Amino acid sequence: MKRVTLAIIVFTFVALAAALPAAAQPGAPPCGIAGTWIGQVGDTPLMATYANVVGVVAGTSNLDLYGDPTLGSPYFSAATRNTSGRGVWTRVDRRTYDYMFVAVGLAADNSVLYQLKVWGTKTLGPHCGTMEVTATLDIFAPWQNPLGDEPPAYGSIPGLSGTAKRMPF
């Protein structure tokens, strides 16, 4: 009978420990960025999904951008939409990640007007449910390689920031 009681007690403790969020456990692994996040950077609302590719140290991202495709500039007044952003992220420390993604600004006829390279850092909050974001927006001409060494033909917008919340399970 003692063994059965002991087994029930041990099982109960294991079940309770498994139910606790990882961030609440002492010595727990760092927060992970994988999941879906909703937020805003600057004036642009966004929804982002991050997937782990190399364990929890690097992965891919897919971002839907809901902002003004003209970027507030008369130079891009023909822009009617942006593509989704596609990119990568890598862990810097327990709660901080570097990221970069590329999106394209399109006219009504689907011609490319500009390419965006957005890069910065994401820092997760203490309970892994919020994220502080910094961003620099580089605006490249359609003929440029946004991953190359050439400076962006249309300039950069540094110092953007925002927040996001993790979509709960």
Where are these predicted regions, by residue range?
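Bacterial N-terminal signal peptides that target proteins for export
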Residues: 1-8
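Bacterial N-terminal signal peptides
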Residues: 8-18
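Boundary at the C-terminal end of the N-terminal hydrophobic targeting segment
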Residues: 17-26
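N-terminal glycine/threonine-rich, aromatic-flanked beta-hairpin/loop signature
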Residues: 45-96, 104-107, 130
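Hydrophobic/aromatic beta-strand elements that line small-molecule binding cavities or substrate pockets
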Residues: 47-52, 84-90, 115-126, 161-164
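Acidic, glycine-rich flexible loop segments
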Residues: 97-138
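Edge beta-strand at a domain terminus
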Residues: 137-169
